[in-house]
Amino acid sequence: MYEISQVNRYINPTMELLPSRNYLDGTVGIRSGIAPGFWFDVFGGYKITNDEVFFVPTLLPPSLQGDIFANTSVAMQANAKHAFGGVNLKYSYQQLFDINLKGVYNSWNVDDIEDAYGKPEMELTAGITVRPISQVTASLDYYLATGRKTFLGRPEGEKMKNINELNLTGTYTLNDTFGLYLKLNNVLFQKYELYYGYPMQSFSAMIGVNINF
């Protein structure tokens, strides 16, 4: 349970889970650098897993229902087939800036349960890193995940809000050993849940010191 709690810290600690086993996990693709500093990667893959884990809220029996939910998650397990495909684009101009854009479509086929609860259908990752001077780096990272569902007692599932997060990171290098950094998370103040019933913080900031050994 320790390993699974590193993935979902809200998991019911009394649960006993079967180990997941991958019988196939393959990816193929084409990668090419079509111009100086620019390359693309078109890829697709297929994965077969026995006893894949899908996190859903804990539902109380009718006699115990308050708000229906307990304060833990449970893990449904089912044999799953996962097909995916996407494209990854990157562009780098000297040492001034880097741009990346990645889109992935996921298709799930699961046994015994109606849906791949909690898994996104579409994912988009984008980022840009700018280095105006050698000591300063600023990065903007965006992640969008759509098409997620959770289980609230009805087999067809309930739609979850899209993950829609924009983060900003800035670093300043003082010397070869020390540096400063500032990270602003969810600067769009979006409200969503990574796991149903546990909303993510709408905004957070972190400042610190980098030490290179």
Model-predicted regions and their roles:
Residues M1-G26, G44-I68, Y143-G153, F189-S202:
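Surface-exposed extracellular loop regions of Gram-negative outer-membrane beta-barrel proteins
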Residues M1-T49, Y93-L96, T129-T137, T173-N175:
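Structural signature of Gram-negative outer-membrane beta-barrels, strongest in the C-terminal barrel
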Residues R9-Y10, F69, G170, G179:
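Short, functionally important structural connectors and interaction interfaces within domains
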Residues P13-P19, T72-A78, D111-Y117, R154-K159, ...:
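Outer-membrane beta-barrel domain signature
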Residues G26-V28, S32, V42, G85-V87, ...:
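Membrane-embedded beta-strands of outer-membrane beta-barrel proteins
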Residues T27, A75-Q77, N167, N186:
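Asparagine-centered polar/low-complexity signal
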Residues P36-V53, T58-G147:
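Gram-negative outer-membrane beta-barrel transporters
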Residues Y105, A116-F213:
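Conserved C-terminal beta-signal and adjacent last beta-strands/turns
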